[in-house]
């Protein structure tokens, strides 16, 4: 079983890892309404801040089986962050609410997973869909042969030219 859980209650992927946007180093999970954001695994908050691009953002460092991972949760609802730098969080703990802050064109969670520490070049980014599952069952952090599949992939539409912004699928 995967060591990382889905960071929100929707698995609707509106923009995948890289794909048509090679500089998109995470996945976008989106759905209208109120959606809490959860820590994908237990760890220590490395950053909890407001970024011009990520908006309301939290980064968490995890050490799993001696390996360092870092998760990024971006575009959270204004004022919804419930943790600060240095806090220890447990897997599934609510850390905020899905929103539309920063460089964003609609409510969604931009979620990144890095094998190693996050860096500005995002050279450690891996596709989160290869590692997400239903929880910590003492298994592995290696990609699953059959990762939990997202719902909602369809035809992409975007208000931005050349694929900029999040893609909304119908």
Language-model-derived ranges and their functions:
Residues 16, 32, 63, 74-76, ...:
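Generic beta-structure capping elements
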Residues 15, 27-29, 60, 74, ...:
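Preference for bulky hydrophobic residues occupying beta-strand positions
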Residues 44, 74-81, 129-135:
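A short, sequence-level motif marking secondary-structure junctions
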Residues 144-170:
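Cell-wall glycan-active module
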Residues 1-12, 121-151:
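Intrinsically disordered, low-complexity
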Residues 1-56, 65, 91, 100, ...:
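Surface-exposed, glycine-biased beta-strand/turn segments
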Residues 32, 38, 48, 67-92, ...:
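Short histidine-centered loop motifs in beta-beta connectors
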Residues 56-62, 69, 87-139:
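Conserved, short, structured surface segments that act as functional micro-motifs
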């Amino acid at each position: 079983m995967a060591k990382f859980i889905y960071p929100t209650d929707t698995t609707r992927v509106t923009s995948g890892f890289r794909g048509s946007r090679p500089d998109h180093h995470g996945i976008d999970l989106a759905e209208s309404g109120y959606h809490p954001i959860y820590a994908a695994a237990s760890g220590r908050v490395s950053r909890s801040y407001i970024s011009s691009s990520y908006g309301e953002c939290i980064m968490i460092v995890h050490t799993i089986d001696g390996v360092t991972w870092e998760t990024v949760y971006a575009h959270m609802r204004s004022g919804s962050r419930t943790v600060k730098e240095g806090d220890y969080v447990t897997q599934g703990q609510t850390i905020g609410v899905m929103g539309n802050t920063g460089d964003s064109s609609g409510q969604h969670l931009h979620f990144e997973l890095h094998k190693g520490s996050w860096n500005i070049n995002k050279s450690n980014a891996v596709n989160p869909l290869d590692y997400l599952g239903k929880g910590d069952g003492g298994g592995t952090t290696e990609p699953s042969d059959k990762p939990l599949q997202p719902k909602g992939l369809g035809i992409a539409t975007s208000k931005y030219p050349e694929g900029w912004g999040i893609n909304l699928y119908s």
